[in-house]
Each structure stands twice: as C-alpha cells, then as structure tokens.
C-alpha cells in the first residue's frame, strides 16, 4: 500500500514524494527469531484472540447490497471453517454498530453473545470437523471519528479530479471487521473467497478473482459475482463500486501458459481513460518484468487489475488493486505486492517489511530495467529520507501502531535500502534473484517472518546475514564513513572509520563498503573493503599514486552518510597488519601463482578493477593458486588473516 498525502481520517503516515508511501527498542535476536508478535485485531483482547485460533478459516462468501453514494450496506457474510480442536463455540468479529438480523451455524438459526466487536456463537464440533457461520446484517461502517481504533474499512467519497462518486474498501491492517464478519489473523488465510455485489445498473463492482457472472435483477440493479480460487488474507478481500468503464488489456510474459488479463475499472468520465491509458498500459510491461524476476504471477489463471478510487496512492487488493491514479512507481509497487504481500504475506505486522520493503524495492528494480537513467537518483532519495532521523528499526516493535507499521521512512525506505545492500553483499545477481524465487516458492500462498527471508538468503547465497540482520533489520541507525590515506611509495595505507547514528543501540556496522579511488596517470579503481570494526586499516599494494578524489560507496549500495576524506601522513599500520609481508609470486603471471610470506591459512578474494568479487577461496602457505580461465588483466586480491587484511595487485598475462 502506498499513499502520497496524509488523510487525518486514515491514520496513515505518508511521504511527500509523489505516490510514495503508505498507510523502536532492541532485544536479543534469539528472542525475536520466529517470534510471533500477536496477530492482532486491535479490538479484541488476548483471550478473545486465543479463541479465534481454535479454528481455521477456509472460505469467505459475501453477498452484499451496495451503492456508490453511501457506505450503507446490507446482506450476508459467511465463512466456512475447520475446528482445530473440539470446540463448543466460535468467536469472530463484526463492528458493534452494524445491525445483526440473524446468525446461522450450518444453516440453523442460533443465538449469540455480542460484546463489542466480538461475536460468540455455539458450534459444538469435534476436532477436524467443518462448520459454516452465516451472518445477515446491515448498517453503515464506521469512520475514523466513530472508530478511533481504525475507520475507513469502507469509505464513500467523490474524486476531486474527476467528480465520480465511489465506495471502496481498505481493510489493512485492522479494518476488515468494520464491513464484513471475519477472523482478523494474518496466519489464517482462507483458501478462497466469493464476493457477490448487488449495485445500481449504472455502476460496476470490482473485487477479487474472476468475474463469473453479471446478473440483471430487473429492478434497476445487477449482481456482480466474483470468485477467487487462491489463498487470501482477510485484509486483501475488497470491494469497489462506481460508475466505471472496463478497460482490459493483456500481458504476455515469457514462459506464461497464456496471456494474463489486466482488467481496469476506470471512472466513466470521457477524459479519465485517455489521461491514464499510457500509464495503465505499462502494467503489462511490469508484469512481464516481475514474472522473470520472482517467478510466475501468482494469480495468472485469474487476472490482475485496478479499480479507481479517490485515494492518494494505492492498496494492493489481491488481483485487483484499488488505486487513485497511475504513475510508473505507484503501479509497479502495487503490482509487486501480488508477490510480496499477497502470495507471501507477513506473518505479523512486526514483519511488514516482507510486504512493503520488498514492494518498495521493486520500484527500484522496475526503474533499473526500464528507466535506468532514473535509478540512481531514486535510491539516493531513499537513502536521504532514511537519514532525516537518526534512529528506528525496520522491524516493528509496536505492532498495533499503524503510523509505525506503515512508516514511510523505516518500513518502506529503510526496508527497501537494506534489500539493496543484501544484493551488494551477495555480489552476484544470479544468486540474488535466485534468493527471491526460492523465497517465493518456499512460502507460497503462506506467511513468513523477516528472519525467514534471511535464512533463505543465507542458504541460497552462502553469505552469513546474521550480523547484518542484527544491525540493519532489528538494529537502528546508519553509519557515517570517513577515510584517511597515506601514500607509501606505490602502496597506500587506507583507514576507514565509521560512527553510528544510534550508537546506544547499534554501535557498529560490519557490512562491506566500496571506495572509488582516483589514481594519477591510471584509471580510477573501485575496491571493496570488508569492515569488522569502527576503524579498519588496509594496506593496498601497488595501487599507484592516489589522485585528488576518493568516493565512499560510489554506486549507492549502503545507507550511509559522508564524513570526510583526507590525506594523513601520520598514518601507520597496526603492527599486526604490517607484519603480514605478503606478495604475489610471480607477478605478472599466467594465472598460477603463490603468496610469498603467507604463514597461516587465510581467505583470498579476487576482485576486478570495478570492485566486483570474482572468486573467494581458502588459501594455505605455499599453495599454488590457479585462476586460469579468468581473462587476462589486472585484478585486486584481498587476503584476510587472523591479524588483519591486506590487498595486493595481481596481473595475469
């Protein structure tokens, strides 16, 4: 979900960038791994939530009468469920001001107990038994004024740009119960849903899945019958009613079994579609791009699409996003949610990064591939926004605070930025995109925590991301880097230091960092440095004479601020590093060489002059190292020993 301006009624924190963002304490990671912050409805007590966990929802059916000029609704909401243990009652939610006419359990009228939003009905079934609860109800859902805990689950408004009257739903995170009876638990996805909407003949009604039928009722109304046959979380079930026109296009991804339908319900205003048509058409390009990056579009047997509503952004309702307007980053963001948030959903609101951090990073991926001239400024803006304040973690401690859950700075921008850095740490796009696909397949149609993505990334790439997650996902702040250097003949001593913006929480950041070094009479070179402390010294052999410029993180991979860069002729290496008097023998060579002076087992990393890691291996004293098959040229090798790190130049001929 993304919003561009603050609506007092919505409680969503948003950013000032066009179409940018939606509607903090540290504990030890071992206590957070796989921790389930309560899967909360903001309106239920802990004991009431526990009662809802005694059954599993399989199917939702909504059969509602609605218009486009009022949020008043009437009809039936039912769900089928399976008892997870023997139960004598079932508890679910519906907003207390909505009037209940009858409740049926397995087709039989029953009495019920209603306390606030909690409705408790007798069920009396054994473990594994199925049951159906049908609630007939009517009324006007609350606004933010009448429900301070939420509001806006169902909204009526008029488009200020186009004049169209619209009623639409927006249930994330806790507002589904404001307009239909449900169980608000992230980890209990229904297997499918059906939404039947009876609306005036002048309107269309959009929802999830396929439009199976439009039934004219002969009284000035028609019933739109939608069916979605995939697992779906409660907050992704949607309705939108307005005077729409249907503009349907198709995407044709490589490898897809058939074209993918993109059904767009656009305001029935002669100027609206012409204004947005080119932008809407790009949706097909984005589906084709993401299909290759993440795996098949999860709902390719049904559709993707949009329903317009007067919101300042979008909401990723499953298979049919509700969107206020169309531009490339907003449309890409909401589409990306079909993978990141819908196909795989955060298992708790504390892990909203699974949804919003990844959808935000998909904006960058779209620009990188389709509008590459815009990608650098986009990521720079993301980093700059994160650094407008010193603290804050991506992981959400207060999972009932909607402003914090949907923080544009932390959930969206920092969440996006730390994925970008993980890609840099892997230093291999094949592994990075394999990680994304492996994660999608591992948690298909299910839910996951942030640490689940960490584990998939580690397994796929071989990179240890445990310290990184402690510092960047659970931790707070960002580093400010400074560089000092000293020329020693043709070699250079480089000292990289960093301070932390929130040192009482995260004092040190141990992700690698790259420096682009200008050299006199030679091509600039980019060297990647492994950071282990707030101050690290490196000896770069045969670097050449340093020129007038050293740039920290030239490609913008890491959220960081700039301190200073200066020549410092007082620098001297720590003795332990200076003692590592190691050289490449012979040099130049034909791709086979040894490390003279190496007296312990170490780790060798081979980089090209652009700073790209080509090989990593363990090396022993007196070992012949074979890199034949690498193109002839100049390389840098980094040797990590118990006493420090040394970088040498290597030439193959």
Language-model-detected regions and their locations in the chain:
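Edge beta-strands of extracellular beta-sandwich domains
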Residues: 558-570, 645-652
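Bacterial Sec-dependent N-terminal signal peptides
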Residues: 1-29, 573, 612, 647, ...
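Acidic/His-enriched low-complexity segments
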Residues: 22-285, 289-294, 443, 490, ...
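C-terminal outer-membrane/trafficking sorting elements
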Residues: 574-653
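Juxtacatalytic substrate-recognition/specificity segment
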Residues: 195, 246-351, 403-405, 550
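Beta-strand-rich binding/interaction modules
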Residues: 99-104, 485-551, 602-606
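Amphipathic alpha-helical substructures
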Residues: 408-494
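Acidic/His/Gly-enriched intrinsically disordered linker/tail segments
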Residues: 356-421, 425, 443-444
């Amino acid at each position: 979900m993304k919003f561009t301006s603050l609506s007092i009624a919505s409680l969503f924190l948003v950013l000032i960038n066009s179409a940018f963002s939606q509607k903090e304490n540290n504990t030890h990671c071992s206590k957070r791994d796989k921790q389930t912050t309560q899967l909360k409805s903001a309106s239920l007590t802990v004991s009431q939530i526990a009662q809802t966990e005694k059954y599993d929802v399989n199917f939702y059916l909504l059969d509602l009468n609605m218009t486009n000029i009022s949020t008043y609704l009437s009809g039936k909401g039912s769900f089928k469920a399976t008892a997870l243990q023997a139960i004598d009652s079932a508890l679910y939610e519906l907003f207390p001001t909505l009037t209940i006419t009858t409740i049926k359990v397995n087709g039989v009228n029953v009495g019920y107990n209603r306390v606030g939003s909690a409705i408790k009905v007798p069920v009396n079934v054994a473990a594994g038994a199925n049951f159906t609860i049908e609630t007939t109800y009517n009324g006007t859902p609350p606004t933010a004024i009448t429900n301070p805990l939420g509001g806006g689950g169902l909204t009526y408004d008029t488009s200020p740009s186009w004049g169209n009257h619209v009623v639409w739903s927006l249930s994330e995170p806790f507002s589904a119960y404001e307009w239909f009876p449900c169980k608000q638990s992230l980890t209990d996805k229904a297997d499918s849903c059906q939404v039947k909407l009876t609306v005036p003949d002048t309107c269309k009604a959009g929802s999830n899945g396929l439009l199976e039928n439009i039934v004219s009722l002969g009284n000035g109304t028609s019933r739109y019958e939608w069916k979605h046959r995939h697992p779906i979380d409660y907050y992704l079930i949607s309705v939108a009613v307005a005077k729409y026109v249907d503009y349907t296009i198709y995407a044709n991804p490589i490898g897809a079994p058939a074209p993918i339908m993109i059904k767009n319900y656009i305001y029935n205003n002669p100027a609206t579609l012409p204004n947005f048509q080119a932008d809407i058409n790009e949706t097909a390009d984005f589906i084709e791009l993401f299909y290759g990056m993440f795996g098949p579009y999860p709902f390719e047997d049904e559709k993707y699409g949009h329903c317009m509503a007067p919101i300042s952004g979008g909401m990723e309702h499953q298979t049919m996003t509700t969107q206020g307007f169309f531009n490339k980053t907003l449309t890409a963001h909401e589409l990306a949610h079909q993978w990141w948030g819908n196909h795989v959903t955060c298992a708790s609101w504390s892990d909203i990064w699974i949804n919003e951090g990844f959808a935000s990073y998909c904006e960058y991926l779209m620009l990188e591939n389709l509008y590459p001239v815009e990608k650098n400024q986009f990521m720079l803006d993301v980093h700059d926004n994160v650094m407008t304040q010193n603290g804050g973690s991506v992981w959400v401690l207060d999972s009932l605070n909607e402003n914090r859950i949907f923080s544009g700075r932390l959930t969206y921008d920092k969440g996006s930025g730390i994925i970008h850095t993980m890609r840099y740490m892997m230093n291999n796009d094949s592994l990075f995109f394999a990680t994304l696909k492996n994660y999608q397949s591992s948690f298909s149609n299910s839910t996951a925590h942030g640490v689940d993505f960490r584990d998939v990334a580690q397994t796929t790439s071989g990179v240890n991301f445990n310290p990184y997650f402690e510092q960047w996902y659970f931790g707070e702040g960002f580093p400010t880097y400074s560089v000092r250097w000293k020329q020693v003949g043709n070699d250079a001593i480089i000292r990289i230091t960093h301070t932390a913006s929130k040192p009482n929480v995260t004092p040190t950041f141990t992700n690698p960092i790259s420096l682009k070094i200008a050299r006199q009479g030679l091509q600039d070179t980019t060297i990647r440095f492994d950071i282990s402390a707030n101050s690290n010294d490196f000896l770069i052999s045969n670097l050449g004479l340093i020129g007038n410029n050293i740039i920290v993180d030239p490609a913008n991979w890491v959220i960081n601020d700039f301190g200073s860069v200066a020549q410092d002729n007082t620098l001297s290496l720590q003795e332990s590093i200076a003692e590592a008097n190691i050289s490449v023998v012979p040099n130049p060579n034909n791709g086979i060489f040894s490390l003279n002076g190496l007296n312990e087992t170490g780790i060798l990393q081979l980089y090209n002059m652009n700073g790209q890691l080509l090989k990593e291996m363990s090396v022993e004293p007196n070992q012949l190292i074979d890199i034949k098959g690498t193109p002839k040229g100049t390389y840098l090798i980094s040797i990590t020993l118990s006493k420090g790190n040394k970088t040498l130049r290597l030439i193959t001929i």
